[in-house]
A protein has these predicted regions:
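Glycine-rich hexapeptide-repeat left-handed beta-helix
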Residues: 3-184
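Terminal amphipathic alpha-helical/low-complexity segments used for targeting or macromolecular assembly
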Residues: 110-395
Length: 395
């Protein structure tokens, strides 16, 4: 279900399921699932991408005019580029981040996912975590499964669509720690903080810590609820027994191998098997990927269980019903808080300034009526009603 057409030019590149390439150009790219580029002026070169949307005129350079075109870069899953954006490789952009402007200072924001990278006067400004409240990010996560064009019941690419997973949440843990360390090192009253070659404004840093903490509360709370739901517990011992993971697989670092999210230990074991010759057929490799994909939630719980003590300061082996209630209350606050932020973000699309008429002329009232006929009014928008329903259910 990969579509390349309308004079799309690609060389030395690999495209996976549900990629779309039209009009533009690709050279030496690894295009994971849902890498989409539609514009004639867009060049993707020497990079790894997945769940990515390239704006018109987006391009990168893998050549610094010294030792030849030897550099490469990565836009992690869900990254987007705006029109006329530019990145000088080597660089790495964190998951679900937005790149706007020209970036030449080789930033690595992989541990600050859901961020905006904005260029002002040749300087990269980083706004960490802000896309967690973006209606665009939520819409993207909802649309990808719906746009899966594969018709065969036996799907060869194992794709995990989860926005919050051990892969992204482990980066939030690191990002939260990084931001706290920056604030400690430079002082709470600094206007600007320096991170690698990027700048972070004070207000953005403080909000970023809050965004990451909210998302971590949401993920860990959700994991605990899923683990305990549907069972009546009479004692704390029963709760502790149920919380114990079913396997040790899942602890430690997780990786996203272009769609499949899995523990790094399992990927390393597969690589060792290939190198030693014990895994010597493509069908065996695919069977391993399928096993990891099917056991995702089992492995995810092992990871989440390990994080309970680090984040909440609660030893899972001594956890009580009161502790669970505390975690669930924090989870509810996080879910409803994020929903309200997404709701407010969606509201901007329906502000008077954003309302455009669809004719050649017309008064302000006619423009508003035009907009309403085409887009509907705010409160009846399907996405908005879904968010409001979600808030109502959770409260």
């Amino acid at each position: 279900a990969c579509k390349l057409g309308h004079n799309y030019s690609a060389s030395d590149s690999l495209f996976f399921s549900n990629c779309q390439g039209e009009n533009g150009e690709a050279c030496a790219i690894f295009a994971g699932p849902y890498t989409v580029t539609h514009h004639k002026s867009t060049l993707l070169i020497a990079g790894m991408f997945s769940f990515m949307n390239a704006g018109s005129g987006s391009n990168q350079s893998n050549h610094m005019y010294k030792l030849g075109p030897i550099h490469q870069g990565t836009l992690e899953r869900g990254a987007k580029t705006t029109s006329d954006s530019y990145i000088l490789w080597p660089a790495r952009v964190g998951a679900f981040s937005l790149v706007m402007g020209r970036h030449v200072n080789h930033s690595d924001t992989s541990n600050l996912p859901f961020s905006n990278l904005i260029e002002q006067n040749n300087t990269t400004y980083l706004v960490p975590g802000v896309n967690l409240r973006s209606v665009g990010t939520i819409r993207d996560a909802q649309k990808w499964p719906k746009r899966d064009q594969r018709t065969d019941t036996n799907k060869l690419d194992f794709i995990n669509y989860n926005l919050l997973s051990p892969y992204t949440v482990q980066k939030m843990f690191k990002g939260r720690e990084t931001l706290k360390n920056l604030r400690y090192a430079s002082g709470e009253l600094s206007d600007i903080y320096s991170f690698h070659s990027a700048k972070i404004r004070n207000s953005a840093l403080v909000k970023g810590i809050g965004f990451y903490e909210t998302a971590i509360h949401k993920f860990l709370g959700n994991s605990v609820i899923k683990r305990l739901e549907g069972i009546d517990f009479r004692t704390n011992e029963e709760i502790r027994a149920r919380l114990k993971p079913d396997t040790s697989i899942g602890s430690g670092e997780w990786v996203d191998i272009s769609g499949l999210i899995a523990p790094k230990s399992e990927i390393d074991a597969l690589i060792d098997g290939i190198e030693s010759g014990t895994v010597n057929r493509l069908k065996y490799i695919n069977a391993e990927f399928e096993r990891m994909h099917q056991n995702y939630y089992t492995y995810e719980w092992t990871w989440a269980y390990d994080k309970l003590e680090e984040f909440y300061g609660i030893n899972p082996e001594k956890i009580t019903a009161e502790d669970i209630i505390h975690i669930v209350e924090k989870w509810k606050e996080a879910v409803v808080g994020l929903d309200r932020m997404v709701y407010e973000d969606a509201k901007k699309e329906f502000s008077l300034a954003s309302m455009t008429g669809f004719g050649a002329d017309g008064s302000r009232l006619e423009k508003e009526l035009d907009f309403e006929q085409v887009r509907g009014d705010f409160e009846s928008n399907p996405f908005v009603t879904a968010v409001l329903k979600h808030i109502e259910v959770k409260t």
